[in-house]
From Swiss-Prot:
Interacts with C1QTNF8. Residues 26-63 form the LDL-receptor class A domain. Gene3D superfamilies: Low-density Lipoprotein Receptor, Rhodopsin 7-helix transmembrane proteins, Ribonuclease Inhibitor. Residues 91-127 form the LRRNT domain. One of its GO terms (biological process) is adenylate cyclase-activating G protein-coupled receptor signaling pathway. GO terms for molecular function: G protein-coupled peptide receptor activity; metal ion binding. This is Relaxin receptor 1. It is a multi-pass membrane protein. Receptor for relaxins. The activity of this receptor is mediated by G proteins leading to stimulation of adenylate cyclase and an increase of cAMP. Binding of the ligand may also activate a tyrosine kinase pathway that inhibits the activity of a phosphodiesterase that degrades cAMP. The lineage of its organism: Eukaryota, Metazoa, Chordata, Craniata, Vertebrata. One of its GO terms (cellular component) is plasma membrane. Disulfide bonds join C27-C40, C34-C53, C47-C62, C485-C563. Residues 430-443, 508-527, 599-629, 682-757 are cytoplasmic.
Length: 757
């Protein structure tokens, strides 16, 4: 509720009644009728902006007009009238209040002195009926400053500098019905200050500095219907009956204060109250009988407080309640029978609340409920009889599908197929490759296996999207809490971490061999196997630790439909947040920095050697080829990881990140490395291209011989892959053959780099 909305309180003339035509059509659970025809449509087709019924019935009454907001349109014009430059509309333009200050405007019996730098209440004819003194410099209201205005009905004193009001300031205003004191500096109201305002219906004192009130403060307000004290600094309400001198009070707005609790006696005399707004306070405790006297209450707003526990029967006397807001409270648990007595409830807001024990039983008694609001759209499946449930999506999934976007539903299969095919192809072709360095081949196969897991992960997500197609919301919560989701999420993290660590290992091997060619020792079989095993063990530990302690990590992988824990700081435990940051901004960021630094150093080393080794004439061309290859390796790593680092960092800063980001990252960004690694590290290397050319040449030769009837003996399909250290003949590595050591270094570097170009 904003400060401007206070003017909507004109609607407080009586309690509204919502009339709805009876429906003879009976629909099954989760389906709702199309007006007066026999057709029924599922919940997800109602209020979706499309005329699915054919008679617009599914798009009617979609707005949440429960509570007093039902009267919004009726009094919308009045709101603008009261907040416009000329708030009055007298029947005659002629001024009937005698002489007025030069800067003021007058029409009929209404006086407008807004923004005229007045420092005191002007003296005009006593027959004035409305007076607006907004945006002036009035600091005090002395005794009897309005005593002559017996006919005054509306008094506007907003946006002045009023700090004190005399107990006799409003004496004589026997006809006043509306008093606005908003946006001033009032710190205290003396008991009896409103004693003469027997006809006052609206009292608006929002955005002041009031720190305490008591029942005597409102003595004399026998006709008051609306009391607005929002955005003050009240820390507590009196332990005595607050409405003792306001028997007709219908609307009490205390939003935006610092109230810590509500006591049983406070509201005991407010039996006519129909709207109670207590949002944005610091209420942390409620007694079971707090609202017992409010049997006519129609709307209750307790949103954005610090309530942790709700007594089971706290709402048992609120049988007329139609709108309840409990949003953004740290409520630990909602009882299964919490709402059983709210038989007329039509709108329930539970946004921002993690309902760990959610079940259909909670909402089944609410047969008149038409609107419900949750923190997670998956919760909507537990209220299938409610026509409108929000949110409809978390940006990743929708009520209908695990993957909300058609683009995502298509490309999850395309990306997974490309990823799996590329990596499986490289793995399967290894038996046909005679490699002098089995250890390098072993590392590449290990990398392909890790990347292939990412393709499998995407296949599984696509498969469950197909399984739940059209009715995902029925299965959403169970899916995210299921073992399948936990395992598939672990698979994605396993693939990611093993791939990152393997790329770092391969990069460091290249870095040492190229930058320090004479110190490079051929990696032994035992060392390589040990490193690979340690990398996989580390990946398994990182991926599966969150499954070992549910209390510490909560539902780590089940924060969204794709089971990937990229950013979910709003639902994670502190331990899970630290763990997630350690993975994405710890291990992965460090690995990315190492890779970028290593490739930069490798290229710089080759370039520096070429400056002094004039014997190598084609070095510039080789450098360009090398630079291009290194650029694409670093570029794909950056393309994959920089967006993830940015998203994770922004989530730590509490920046709101659209849910769609996660699905796009998981389907299009995260698999980039997994899909391109086979291309960058195998399919575009010189040995592979030479093997393809050789195979094609042999195929053409064999075909030519066959056409001539000659017998051919083509070499088998074998790719001879050379480890960089083995490509130079031993006799060429003798130092005596080179004038300068750097020449030998360059030859060695050039030879090593041939396998990467």
């Amino acid at each position: 509720m904003t400060s401007g909305s206070v003017f909507f309180y004109i609607l407080i003339i009586g309690k509204y009644f919502s009339h709805g035509g009876g429906q003879d059509v009976k629909c099954s659970l989760g389906y709702f009728p199309c007006g007066n025809i026999t057709k029924c449509l599922p919940q997800l087709l109602h209020c979706n902006g499309v005329d699915d019924c054919g008679n617009q019935a599914d798009e009617d009454n979609c707005g949440d007009n429960n509570g007093w907001s039902l009267q919004f349109d009726k009094y919308f014009a009045s709101y603008y009238k009261m907040t416009s430059q000329y708030p009055f509309e007298a029947e005659t333009p002629e001024c009937l209040v005698g002489s007025v200050p030069v800067q003021c405007l007058c029409r009929g019996l209404e006086l407008d002195c807004d923004e005229t730098n007045l420092r005191a209440v002007p003296s005009v004819s006593s027959n004035v009926t409305a007076m607006s003194l907004q945006w002036n410099l009035i600091r005090k209201l002395p005794p009897d400053c309005f005593k002559n205005y017996h006919d005054l009905q509306k008094l506007y004193l907003q946006n002045n500098k009023i700090t004190s009001i005399s107990i006799y300031a409003f004496r004589g205003l026997n006809s006043l019905t509306k008093l606005y004191l908003s946006h001033n500096r009032i710190t205290f109201l003396k008991p009896g200050v409103f004693e003469d305002l027997h006809r006052l219906e609206w009292l608006i004192i929002e955005d002041n500095h009031l720190s305490r009130i008591s029942p005597p403060t409102f003595y004399g307000l026998n006709s008051l219907i609306l009391l607005v004290l929002m955005n003050n600094v009240l820390t507590r309400l009196p332990d005595k009956p607050l409405c003792q001198h306001m028997p007709r009070l219908h609307w009490l707005d205390l939003e935006g204060n610092h109230i810590h609790n509500l006591r049983n006696l406070t509201l005991i005399s407010c039996s006519n109250l129909t709207v109670l707004v207590m949002g944005k306070n610091k209420i942390n405790h409620l007694n079971e009988n707090t609202f017992a006297p409010l049997q006519k209450l129609d709307e209750l707003d307790l949103g954005s407080n610090k309530i942790e526990n709700l007594p089971p029967l706290i709402f048992k006397d609120l049988k007329e309640l139609s709108q309840l807001n409990l949003s953004y409270n740290p409520i630990q648990k909602i009882q299964a029978n919490q709402f059983d007595y709210l038989v007329k409830l039509k709108s329930l807001s539970l946004e921002g609340i993690e309902i760990s024990n959610i079940q259909q039983r909670m909402f089944r008694p609410l047969m008149n409920l038409s609107h419900i609001y949750f923190k997670k759209f998956q919760y909507c499946g537990y209220a299938p009889h409610v026509r409108s449930g929000k949110p409809n999506t978390d940006g990743i999934s929708s009520l209908e599908n695990l993957l909300a976007s058609i683009i995502q539903r298509v490309f999850v299969w395309v990306v997974s197929a490309v990823t799996c095919f590329g990596n499986v192809f490289v793995i399967c072709m290894r038996p046909y490759i005679r490699s002098e360095n089995k250890l390098y081949a072993m590392s590449i196969i290990s990398l392909c296996c890790a990347d292939c897991l990412m393709g499998i992960y995407l296949f599984v997500i696509g498969g469950f999207d197909l399984k739940f197609r059209g009715e995902y919301n029925k299965h959403a919560q169970l899916w995210m809490e299921s073992t399948h989701c936990q395992l598939v999420g672990s698979l994605a993290i396993l693939s990611t971490e093993v791939s990152v660590l393997l790329l770092t290992f391969l990069t460091l091997e290249k870095y040492i061999c190229i930058v320090y060619p004479f110190r490079c020792v051929r990696p032994g079989k035992c060392r390589t196997i040990t490193v690979l095993i340690l990398i996989w063990i580390t990946g398994f530990i990182v991926a599966f630790i969150p499954l070992s302690n549910k209390e510490f990590f909560k539902n780590y992988y089940g924060t969204n439909g794709v089971c990937f824990p990229l950013h979910s700081e709003d639902t994670e435990s502190i331990g899970a947040q630290v763990y997630s940051v350690a993975i994405f901004l710890g291990i992965n960021l460090a690995a990315f920095i190492i890779i970028v630094f290593s490739y930069g150093s490798m290229f710089y080393s080759v370039h520096q050697s070429a400056i002094t080794a004039t014997e190598i004439r084609n070095q510039v061309k080789k450098e360009m080829i090398l630079a291009k290859r290194f650029f694409f390796i670093v570029f794909t790593d950056a393309l994959c990881w920089i967006p993830i680092f940015v998203v994770k960092f922004l989530s730590l800063l509490q920046v709101e990140i659209p849910g769609t980001i996660t699905s796009w990252v998981v389907i299009f960004i995260l698999p980039i490395n997994s899909a391109l690694n086979p291309i960058l590290y195998t399919l575009t290397t010189r040995p592979f291209k030479e093997m393809i050319h050789r195979f094609w040449y042999n195929y053409r030769q064999r075909k030519s011989m066959d056409s001539k009837g000659q017998k051919t003996y083509a070499p088998s399909f074998i790719w001879v892959e050379m480890w960089p250290l083995q490509e130079m003949p031993p006799e060429l590595m003798k130092p005596g053959l080179f004038t300068y050591p750097c020449e030998m270094s360059l030859i060695s570097q050039s030879t090593r780099l041939n396998s990467y170009s």
